[in-house]
């Protein structure tokens, strides 16, 4: 890239220190213009007076010089660590603008790092996730991805596939060689089968990586006035939902975001399940059932005194879901093995339920040996590669030309994951998620 760009890398507003980044072919000259000569030693913080084009001192701060290609972006880069007052920041940014630099777009520094092959697309996504991480589980997954865990996996698949493709192309180029078909079967079939198995394992992860990014979904369902909203407030430790004695108080979905076991969790309170009395309640019930259908975990909440509620609720729960008998403080009538007996009003018994929820979240989202798919685009690309590889393997003996074409389709799908091929629309989407200055 020919242009030199700048951006404030720290949050806007008043602060102790502000960091301003600069990258591009003109970074060295602009650093000299503001901080004077001699230029600082690479990657060594140096205290300098920063001057505008008229020679007036704007501030005294630390400057750093990162000559390319040994920088984050792969280009000549510099940083100015100045006092974080708005007037100081504006003065330095204006001086850089006057020197010929341009304001960076969102994610432009990271995009330049990608285009200069300092990072691949999965590592860029990992960096974005690390910046957004709010829980320990998100931090660990993002750091692993940023450090190249997915890149190494996908590049390994690609290399193995290209090796297998050499055998397929050999069959196509030398069809009259008597020993080629046997060599093809031996050299390509088994590696392709191993690749297919590895991809199946990668996909069959219960969407663990995506859940770590966006949150493990838990939905509270049950009849009106069963105490779902009270339980939500108890788990959230705040008044997130309105609680009254009037059945049907909750009409729309109320969400609360929590951290359990170091992982993000989204708990949803829903409308009570019953024959709706009006169109608004009917829509609330429809949304409740839809949210429950797509939840990672359903918690059925029933009044401990009502057998009728229990029978209806048990028909809506599946293996792995939890059943809560609420309002224990009013007297227990119904009994169910494995049910959690509690009073959401007083909090008695809620601790055991919370511990069980946390254990379920840990079990389903815990780190495993194979890196996790963290985005929908990853899953779709691997599914595309898997479908192409399956066709390729099935056609090895009878149609090697078609097998070769499917192998190339699989390679392209894998390369789209790391950004080896031209995927401009994907790049725009990924880098637009970054803040200015990153």
Swiss-Prot record:
GO terms of molecular function: GTP binding; GTPase activity; metal ion binding
Cellular component per GO, a single term: cytoplasm
Cofactor binding note: Binds 1 potassium ion per subunit.
Cofactor(s) for this UniProt protein: K(+)
Gene3D superfamilies documented for this protein: P-loop containing nucleotide triphosphate hydrolases, Probable tRNA modification gtpase trme, domain 1, tRNA modification GTPase MnmE domain 2
Compartments it resides in: Cytoplasm
Broadest EC class assigned to this enzyme: hydrolase
Residues reported in the UniProt entry to bind K(+): 225, 244, 246, 249
EC number in record: 3.6.-.-
Sorted UniProt keywords: Cytoplasm, GTP-binding, Hydrolase, Magnesium, Metal-binding, Nucleotide-binding, Potassium, tRNA processing
Start and end residues of each TrmE-type G domain: 215-362
Family named by the database record: Belongs to the TRAFAC class TrmE-Era-EngA-EngB-Septin-like GTPase superfamily. TrmE GTPase family.
Subunit structure and binding partners: Homodimer. Heterotetramer of two MnmE and two MnmG subunits.
The protein's name in its UniProt record: tRNA modification GTPase MnmE
């Amino acid at each position: 890239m020919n242009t030199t760009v700048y951006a404030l890398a720290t949050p806007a507003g008043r602060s102790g220190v502000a960091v301003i980044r600069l990258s591009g072919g003109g970074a060295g000259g602009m650093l000299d213009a503001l901080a004077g000569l001699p230029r600082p030693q690479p990657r060594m913080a140096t205290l300098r007076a920063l001057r505008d084009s008229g020679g007036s001192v704007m501030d005294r701060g630390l400057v750093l010089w990162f000559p390319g290609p040994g920088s984050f972006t792969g280009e000549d880069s510099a940083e100015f660590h100045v006092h974080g007052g708005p007037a100081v920041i504006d003065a330095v940014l204006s001086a850089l603008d006057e020197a010929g630099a341009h304001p960076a777009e969102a994610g432009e520094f990271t995009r330049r790092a990608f285009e200069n092959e300092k990072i691949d697309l999965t590592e860029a996504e990992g960096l974005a996730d690390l910046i957004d991480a709010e829980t320990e589980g998100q931090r660990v997954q993002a750091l692993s991805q940023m450090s190249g865990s997915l890149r190494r996996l996908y590049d390994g698949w690609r290399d193995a596939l290209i090796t297998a493709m050499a055998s397929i192309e050999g069959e196509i180029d030398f069809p009259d060689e008597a020993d080629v078909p046997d060599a093809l079967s031996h050299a390509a079939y088994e590696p392709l089968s191993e690749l297919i198995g590895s991809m199946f394992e990668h996909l069959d992860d219960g969407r663990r990586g995506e859940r770590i990014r966006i949150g493990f979904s838990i939905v509270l369902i049950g009849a009106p006035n069963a105490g779902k909203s009270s339980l939500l407030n108890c788990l959230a430790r705040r008044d997130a939902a309105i609680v009254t004695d009037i059945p049907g108080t909750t009409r729309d979905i109320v969400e609360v975001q929590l951290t359990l076991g170091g992982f993000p969790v989204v708990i949803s309170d829903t409308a009570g399940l019953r024959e709706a009395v009006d169109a608004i309640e009917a829509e609330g019930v429809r949304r409740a059932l839809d949210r429950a259908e797509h939840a990672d975990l359903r918690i059925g909440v029933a009044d401990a005194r009502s057998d009728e509620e229990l029978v209806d609720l048990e028909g809506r729960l599946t293996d792995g879901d939890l059943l809560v008998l609420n309002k224990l403080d009013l007297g227990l009538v119904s009994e169910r093995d494995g049910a959690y007996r509690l009073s959401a009003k007083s909090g008695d018994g809620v601790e055991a339920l919370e511990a069980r929820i946390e254990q379920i979240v840990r079990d389903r989202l815990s780190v495993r040996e194979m890196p996790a798919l963290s985005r929908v685009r990853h899953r779709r690309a691997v599914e595309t590669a898997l479908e192409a590889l399956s066709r390729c393997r099935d056609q090895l003996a009878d149609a090697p030309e078609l097998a070769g074409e499917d192998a190339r389709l699989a390679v392209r799908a894998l390369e789209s994951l790391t950004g080896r091929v031209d995927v401009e629309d994907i790049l725009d989407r990924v880098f637009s998620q970054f803040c200015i200055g990153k």
